[in-house]
């Protein structure tokens, strides 16, 4: 009978035809006839087994190459994540999960290191009683620093306190003596001027006294030479009535005598005042 009747069963076992759109190089050869002359039953079984294994391997490769495909033997997503994390941890690419406190500390330390590298914060600081002081270093590679102006130098020199020497003390003593002498001279000049003023006043007063004496003498002469008519017929002196004008003139004369002023005696010799 031979291998003839076993050919259709073997062909049925080989079937898994590729789907549409797959590559042609992975297609299974189903059209190859197996004759009884060229193969034995053992060889046929081995061939069928090899062809089935090859077809399954090709299917797995093709399914894995396509995006979004999941094979029957593929692991679950949780197992894949575990494997990936374990591989990364072993390679040192990912750190182990840490607590929030350790993460915050690490971030703050990184920030401090960056600030120190930039020069904003300095690592070493000297603490004093009154406060803190930092050592600031400036890089003067671009331009050299200029000297401060002379005005600042003068101010610094003024602020410095000098020790007193004997020469300074002697100079101060001499200056004090000169001031004392000048003050004494000024006082003497004032005293001399005050002494000269009363002598001038005394001479003026003497002149005034002489003039007053002369005026007094003149007044006495005028009074002694006053006109007093006598009655030639009866030998009696004529009487004169005093008028208001005479009273006012007498009062004026008295007041003028107090001031050293004398009026003329023309008013005494008036014809109206004589009574016959």
Curated annotation (Swiss-Prot):
Pfam families: Stathmin. Coiled coil: none annotated. A lipid is attached at residue 2 (N-myristoyl glycine). Disulfide bonds: none annotated. Residues 118-244 form the SLD domain. The keyword Lipoprotein applies. Residues 1-40, 61-106, 226-250 are annotated as: Disordered. GO terms for biological process: regulation of microtubule polymerization or depolymerization. Residues 68-78, 87-100 have a biased composition (Polar residues). Keywords: Lipoprotein, Myristate. The keyword Lipoprotein applies. This is Stathmin domain-containing protein 1. It comes from Homo sapiens (Human).
């Amino acid at each position: 009978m031979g291998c003839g009747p076993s050919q259709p069963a073997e062909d049925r076992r080989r079937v898994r035809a590729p789907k549409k759109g797959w590559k042609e190089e992975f297609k299974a050869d189903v059209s190859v006839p197996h004759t009884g002359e060229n193969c034995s039953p053992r060889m046929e079984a081995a061939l069928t087994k090899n062809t089935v294994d090859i077809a399954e391997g090709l299917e797995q490769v093709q399914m894995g190459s396509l995006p979004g495909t999941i094979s029957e033997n593929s692991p679950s997503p949780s197992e894949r994540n575990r494997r990936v994390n374990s591989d990364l941890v072993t390679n040192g690419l990912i750190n182990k999960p840490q607590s929030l406190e350790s993460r915050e500390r690490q971030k703050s330390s990184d920030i401090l290191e960056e600030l120190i590298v930039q020069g904003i914060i300095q690592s070493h600081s000297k603490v004093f009683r009154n406060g803190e002081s930092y050592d600031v270093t400036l890089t003067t590679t671009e331009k050299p620093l200029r000297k401060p102006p002379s005005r600042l130098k003068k101010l610094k020199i003024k602020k410095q306190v000098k020790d007193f020497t004997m020469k300074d003390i002697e100079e101060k003593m001499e200056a004090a003596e000169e001031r004392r002498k000048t003050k004494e001279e000024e006082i003497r000049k004032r005293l001399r001027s005050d002494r000269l003023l009363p002598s001038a006043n005394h001479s003026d007063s003497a002149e005034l006294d002489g003039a007053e004496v002369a005026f007094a003498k003149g007044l006495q002469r005028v009074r002694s030479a006053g006109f007093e008519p006598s009655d030639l017929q009866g030998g009696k002196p004529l009487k004169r009535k005093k008028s208001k004008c005479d009273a006012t003139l007498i009062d004026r004369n008295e007041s003028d005598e107090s001031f050293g002023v004398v009026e003329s005696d023309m008013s005494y010799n008036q014809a109206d005042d004589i009574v016959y």
